[in-house]
């Protein structure tokens, strides 16, 4: 059987009607991509009939290399020229400086922004300083991000009602007490706290601990010392650290999922990303995303603007916003990303 033709280097964004049957072009020759128009006749490659499980927007494979037909699985990222571009290529766009009387922020196209957090804006409660980094006030509709800084000691118990949390430790080794269950961590550990569970942070060390909390759905502030019914599940693994054996390639980039549907995070996917000195092709996602830069410097680019990024900066990407993250550091860049709805970080169009 001949190999299918690559119809396009990126997947097709389509809106499917729940319960309706479709025929996905598997040969790559259809003029009605990503659907069949009969051009497969004589190729030996038959179209795939499938029924949409629900009415939704989704990405159907156009490179015909997916391992999950008809849906995109990110295989197009491995095509030559499918993702990476030279960091020095292309016309330069204006650099937007930080401004504002809130956290210093660079506002880019479509509501995308890069933010450097101002510690003076933190909400202080005992040993804990909690800073809202991304909330609905910034245009986020699906998730919020908070930076938690903890001196030696323990915080009060808190929760975000009717929301899941994925936490990420960037500094120190704080202990997480989730419904009273203790969970030890270290830098670059992701921790899952589900809807209905309460959280208390403890820092037994002299040095400050720093944790980023991604909350979904979006919330503006926590509920302190929550009362009433607390979710009680059997003890389970909550903390997931970096494991080189679990890295997934995405062209010249890599990622590792820390929390996602596979381990019970039904709403949010949290991942570690590694970027060499390069610039991504402009692309979009069907999810709303928050990014924290861990190391390396570069630029976040949108259609007509760009902003410098450095360790500690927070980036907000609205759903469907065209963007490209560039690493300018020879040693590369590391980042933590979290997005809703949960899925694969490799899916882009």
Regions found by a protein language model. Name each.
Residues 156-158, 176-177, 185, 193, ...:
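Short beta-strand His + acidic residue motifs that chelate non-heme Fe in jelly-roll/DSBH
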Residues 139-141, 195-222, 310-313, 319-345:
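Ligand-binding loop in jelly-roll beta-barrel domains
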Residues 26, 147-151, 159-176, 217, ...:
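Short, conserved beta-strand element in jelly-roll/cupin
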Residues 1-34, 39-60, 85:
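N-terminal pre-ligand scaffold of iron-sulfur
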Residues 166, 180-196, 304-319:
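Short acidic-glycine-tyrosine-enriched beta hairpin
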Residues 52-74, 95-104:
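Short Fe-S-cluster ligation motifs
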Residues 91-142, 220-267, 348:
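A short, N-terminal "cap"/entry segment at the start of jelly-roll beta-barrel domains
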Residues 127-134, 144-161, 255-259, 269-285, ...:
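Conserved short histidine dyad/triad with adjacent acidic residue
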């Amino acid at each position: 059987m001949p190999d299918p033709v690559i119809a396009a280097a990126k997947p097709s964004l389509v809106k499917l009607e729940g319960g309706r049957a479709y025929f996905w072009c598997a040969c790559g020759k259809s003029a009605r991509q990503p659907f069949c128009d009969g051009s497969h006749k004589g190729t030996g490659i038959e179209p795939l009939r499938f029924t949409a499980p629900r009415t939704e927007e989704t990405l159907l494979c156009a490179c015909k290399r997916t391992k999950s037909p008809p849906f995109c699985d990110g295989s197009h990222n491995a095509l030559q020229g499918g993702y990476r571009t030279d960091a020095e290529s292309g016309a330069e766009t204006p650099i937007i400086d930080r401004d504002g009387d809130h956290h210093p922020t660079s506002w880019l196209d479509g509501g995308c922004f890069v933010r450097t957090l101002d510690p003076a804006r933190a909400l202080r409660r005992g040993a804990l300083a909690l800073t809202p980094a991304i909330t609905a006030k910034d245009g986020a509709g699906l998730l919020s991000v908070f930076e938690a800084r903890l001196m030696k000691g323990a915080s009060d118990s808190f929760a975000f009602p009717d929301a899941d949390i994925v936490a990420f430790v960037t500094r120190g080794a704080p202990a997480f007490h989730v419904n009273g269950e203790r969970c030890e961590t270290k830098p670059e550990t992701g921790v899952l706290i589900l809807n209905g569970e309460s959280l208390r942070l403890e820092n037994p060390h002299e040095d400050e601990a720093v944790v980023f909390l991604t909350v979904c759905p979006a919330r503006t502030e926590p509920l302190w010392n929550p009362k009433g019914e607390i979710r009680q599940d059997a003890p389970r693994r909550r903390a997931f650290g970096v494991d080189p054996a679990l890295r997934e390639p995405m062209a010249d980039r890599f990622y590792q999922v820390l929390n996602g549907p596979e381990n019970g995070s039904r709403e949010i996917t949290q991942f570690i990303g590694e970027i060499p000195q390069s610039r991504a092709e402009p692309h979009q996602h069907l999810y709303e995303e928050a990014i924290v830069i861990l190391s390396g410097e570069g630029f976040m680019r949108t259609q007509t603007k760009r902003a410098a990024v450095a360790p500690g900066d927070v980036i907000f990407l609205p759903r469907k916003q065209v963007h490209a993250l560039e690493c300018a550091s020879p040693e590369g860049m590391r980042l933590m990303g979290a997005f809703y709805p949960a899925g694969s970080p490799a899916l882009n169009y």
